[in-house]
Amino acid sequence: MDSITVKASATSANLGAGFDVMGIALESPGDIIRVEKADELSIVVKGRGAEGIPADPEKNTAGLVALAMDKKVRITIKSGIRPGSGLGSSAAPAAGTAVAINELFSLGYSKEELVWIAARGEMAAAGIVHADNVAPCIMGGLTLVCNNYVEHVELPPMGVVAVLPEIVVSTKSARGILPQQVPLQEMVLNVSKAAMLMAGVVKKDPVIIGRSLSDTFNEKYRSPLIKGYGSVREAALDSGAYGVAISGSGPTMLALCPEDRSFDVAAAMRKKFEEAGVVSEAYVTCIGKGVRIINRDEEE
């Protein structure tokens, strides 16, 4: 085998109170990543937002992963996730490349090990090593990251709506507005929300999961960056969503809902963005299964 192609889908980190800890995989949108054995490391970026994604391996999340794995490959990324969307646009190439190189060279890394290799790639986008997007991208479902551990949890079936307004929020700038210290009562409330969310997961109760999505940290400080946030959130809940959260650093707003209400929730959210003078697009999707191999090319 001299090349391999994988699909790495979007992810949504934080889920409200699970800041830098929780994340879920979405079935769509996603990147298509082809990795070929080569004499030197190189990257080609095509697709959505390609003009703003560096091809220099030392400045690209996929490139940093290849360097960490010490493999000379040609990486072709067909981007389907808009950069600066809060949907793990930098994590998808990192996660996909880690899985592809592991398979292409038969390295034998576990999914957990691949998560931490892929997390190194996030240095190119966020300036820090963090795994809350690459973990669900690789493992699928819901993941929780704690120190050097990652846990995977299956979620009950539910619809997922991700509405992306035409507002750009970079991970670095969104992190910059967060305070280094928070009041004790806010911390207690956030911990209770995170605990309640996991109670909903254990009980497989999407209603409990949904009402636990709001928080007093990520939402409080980042929602002002999203024009129309309050009315969009209210419209989603009025249309039957279990709960709403800012996806990652934003500006995408994520709604979990009954599968048969997904399109109604998406339409209501987009309408409120439109009333606020903001163009948006919606992804009506479901919980994803993680990076998957879509093609293996054998040597001739």
From Swiss-Prot:
GO biological process, one term: threonine biosynthetic process
GO-annotated cellular components: cytoplasm
Protein name: Homoserine kinase
PANTHER family, alphabetized: HOMOSERINE KINASE, HOMOSERINE/4-DIPHOSPHOCYTIDYL-2-C-METHYL-D-ERYTHRITOL KINASE
Family: Belongs to the GHMP kinase family. Homoserine kinase subfamily.
Function statement: Catalyzes the ATP-dependent phosphorylation of L-homoserine to L-homoserine phosphate.
Superkingdom classification of source: Archaea
Catalytic activity: L-homoserine + ATP = O-phospho-L-homoserine + ADP + H(+)
Biological classification of the source: Archaea, Methanobacteriati, Methanobacteriota, Stenosarchaea group, Methanomicrobia
Residues given in the record as ATP binding sites: 82-92
InterPro entries the record matches: GHMP_kinase_C_dom, GHMP_kinase_C_sf, GHMP_kinase_N_dom, Homoserine_kinase, Ribosomal_Su5_D2-typ_SF, Ribsml_uS5_D2-typ_fold_subgr
Gene from which the chain derives: thrB
